[in-house]
């Protein structure tokens, strides 16, 4: 269970600081529109594979030029030298958070963490938060066993990868809300947990399998919530973001 001190600190954070809006959009114009509308309600914007592939580094620069913070959700998974080089490039772009796959192994994780901190120090700027992707939220127990070939329960595998990430010097992990408690027990109260698979009550689950509401995830001990379609695909994205922020503010 998360400690009382940790929960109190997270509650003190303004609601917007806990919200990462996923910019899963096909082009720069669509991203600009969302950032302009949602900046008052988002502490960070996630630039993922679709947006980065379509717009390249300009996607990151666009958010930064508007005063936003960027989570580069590119899930690097390659040999250590390649991942280290890619991580350095993201530091030079000015991202605030980035991720790599825990499945890449300890040497890859260590290389990425070292590269991020060395590059940030060379540029005389704060190092981005570096986190590891664990089990994708689109996978359930059956898919993990039959398709990926991992026999452990999802929660056990997530906790195992979270411990590996911590040992390798990373700041935290990406994991579904269902595994937050296991990660907290394994890795402690300061470990960063970024949680996708968050859906307001009554909203469409989409392709997510292991989900919670924003309030439930925060009560479990999530550090940040990644929220995409419930905000960006809503008839009124601003109203949707406001409603989620209001729900977060009620968490005690």
Swiss-Prot record:
PROSITE patterns: OMPDECASE (PS00156). Substrate binds at residues 24, 46, 73-82, 137, 199, 208, 228-229. GO terms for biological process: 'de novo' pyrimidine nucleobase biosynthetic process; 'de novo' UMP biosynthetic process. It catalyses: orotidine 5'-phosphate + H(+) = UMP + CO2. The keyword Cell division does not apply. The active site is at 75 (proton donor). Transmembrane segments: none annotated. GO terms for cellular component: cytosol. Keywords: Decarboxylase, Lyase, Pyrimidine biosynthesis. InterPro entries: Aldolase_TIM, OMPdecase, OMPdecase_AS, OMPdecase_bac, OMPdeCOase_dom, RibuloseP-bd_barrel. HAMAP family: OMPdecase_type1_B. Belongs to the OMP decarboxylase family. Type 1 subfamily. PANTHER family: OROTIDINE 5'-PHOSPHATE DECARBOXYLASE (PTHR32119:SF2). Catalyzes the decarboxylation of orotidine 5'-monophosphate (OMP) to uridine 5'-monophosphate (UMP). This is Orotidine 5'-phosphate decarboxylase.
């Amino acid at each position: 269970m998360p400690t009382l001190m940790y929960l109190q600190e997270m509650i003190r954070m303004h609601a917007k600081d806990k919200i990462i809006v996923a910019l899963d959009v096909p082009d720069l114009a669509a991203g600009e529109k969302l950032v302009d509308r949602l900046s008052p309600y988002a502490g960070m914007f996630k630039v993922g594979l679709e947006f980065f592939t379509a717009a390249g580094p300009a996607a990151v620069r666009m958010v930064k030029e508007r005063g936003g913070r960027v989570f580069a959700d590119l899930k690097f998974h390659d040999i250590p030298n390649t991942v280290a080089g890619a991580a350095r490039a993201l530091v030079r772009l000015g991202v605030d958070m980035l991720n790599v796959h825990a499945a890449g192994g300890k040497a890859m994780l260590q290389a990425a963490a070292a590269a991020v901190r060395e590059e940030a120090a060379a540029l005389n700027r704060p190092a981005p938060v570096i986190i590891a992707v664990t089990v994708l939220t689109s996978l359930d127990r059956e898919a993990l066993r039959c398709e990926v070939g991992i026999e452990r329960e999802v929660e056990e595998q997530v906790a195992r990868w979270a411990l590996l990430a911590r040992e390798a010097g990373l700041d935290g992990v990406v994991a579904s809300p269902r595994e937050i408690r296991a990660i907290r027990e394994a890795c402690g109260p300061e470990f960063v947990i970024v949680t996708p698979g968050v859906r307001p009550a009554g909203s469409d689950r989409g392709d997510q399998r292991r989900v919670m509401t924003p309030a439930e995830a925060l009560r479990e001990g999530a550090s940040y919530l990644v929220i995409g379609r419930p905000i960006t695909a809503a008839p009124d994205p601003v109203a949707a973001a406001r409603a989620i922020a209001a729900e977060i503010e009620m968490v005690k």
